[in-house]
Amino acid sequence: DSIQKTNYENYEIIVVDNISADNSHKICKEKFPEIKLIENKENLGYCEGNNVGIRNASGEFIVILNPDTKVEPNWLEELFNTYEKFGDGLYQPKIMAFEDNLFESGGNMLQMFGFGYSKGRGIQDKGQFDEPCEIGYASGACLFTKTNILKKIGLFDPFIFLYHDDLDLGWRARQLGIKSFYAPKSKIYHAGSYNYKWSARKFYWLERNRHYCLLTHYSKKTFYKMLPAIALI
């Protein structure tokens, strides 16, 4: 519901359903008939599911937004305002947990061994991350950019399926000279990150995709030089 309270008027909403097991797609269709609902015939994963939505979008700009988020009315306007300051790039808002005024991300950063981390995660918002700035990569929970920039980067990598998809996208963007930025006056709330419990399955996907990013984005020479350290982590 929060998206429809956005104070920016010129936008479309596209929902991509990866054969969800609950009735969420049916509820969406009944409650929000004006929304463009795309129902995939199989679970394509988070990455390719996003790509399906991107290919069906008609706007000059695009936002990738997780389904377990709530947005402030001015979220989109402030993303545009920060875009006007920095120009072409990938953008993320200030991302908060639903409870206790805790940060989920005040901007994502990338470590040389392929670990991504969020500035401020788990601490209270006291204005310490209120300045727009360049960051390592934009969070996939809410990622704003021009559609042609996203297509220039090559969309999301379907092999990744889920986890580290945003890290990979931001890494590829940086190799093309496309920077990522943090827009703190745009604010959203994200439930997922604090609800997901650690599991062997999640660890598998995170490590699989981290190593995939290292193999993909470093030269073979660099990767083999780093291999002893990678093996110890």
Regions found by a protein language model. Give the residues of each.
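A conserved acidic beta->alpha catalytic loop
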Residues: 2, 17-26, 42
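Glycine-rich, basic loop-to-helix element that forms the pyrophosphate-binding segment
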Residues: 39-57, 67
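Conserved donor NDP-sugar-binding/catalytic core segment of glycosyltransferases
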Residues: 69-112
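A recurrent flexible, glycine/aromatic-enriched loop bordering the glycosyltransferase active site
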Residues: 102-105, 115-117, 123-148, 167-169, ...
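Active-site-adjacent helix/loop segment of glycosyltransferases
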Residues: 176-233
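A short, conserved alpha-helix in the catalytic core of glycosyltransferases
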Residues: 136-187
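Short, acidic, metal-binding catalytic loop of nucleotide-sugar glycosyltransferases
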Residues: 1-10
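Short aromatic/hydrophobic "clamp" motif used to bind/position activated sugar donors
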Residues: 62
